[in-house]
Amino acid sequence: MVALFHKLGPDAPTLCEGWTTRDLAVHLWVRENRPDAAAGVFVKALSGHLEKESRKVAERDFDELVDDWGRGPATYNPVRFVDAQQNFVEHFVHHEDIRRANGMGPRDFSARIKQQMHSYLKLLAKVALRNSTRPVIMQPEGLPRIVAADKHGVADKGDAVVRVSGEVGELILWSFGRDAAEVALEGDAKAAVRSTL
């Protein structure tokens, strides 16, 4: 993603509504290097702190900011200990946010990466789709299906479900509200309430 940031520069569009590549780079840097400020995403009382720190970081030279973020969290930063697990999906989604907004299509991944994506999707789909009004059955190509929002076992008993199929990476994007995801959808799409990342 670092190379793509550098290639496109700070003013390229992203799929994150209203955000440019600079805004996304600032978000990623703050999230990984200033967890005290990043908490403002979830804790309303800290949102002012997040905005202040984000404005300060946004003033940095874009290429230096991207390179700094690309090196990962500082050694003493507690985020470093959960970096791979915490960032795998977020970095994938945000990388695609940049790619898709700039005319690039889906990428091909190895079987190992697809399996890793599937493992994360199994965990995250339950959270990302928890507000759905019908069960959501996701069928990643070549991998076991994933059922989310099946509050009453309906997915096993009936057909009042939403079915989504496609490559596992596309299902991750779709689960997190990215309409650019290349998936096939059957059923009431409005019943599948997706999260954002």
Say what each PLM segment does.
Residues 16-20, 57, 83-86, 163:
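Short, contiguous, pocket-lining structural segments
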Residues 7-11, 34-49, 64-197:
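Structured surface interface patches that mediate subunit assembly and partner/cofactor docking
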Residues 2-5, 53-57:
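Soluble acyl-CoA-dependent acyltransferase catalytic core bearing the H(X)4D motif
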Residues 1-31, 35-40:
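An N-terminal domain-cap segment
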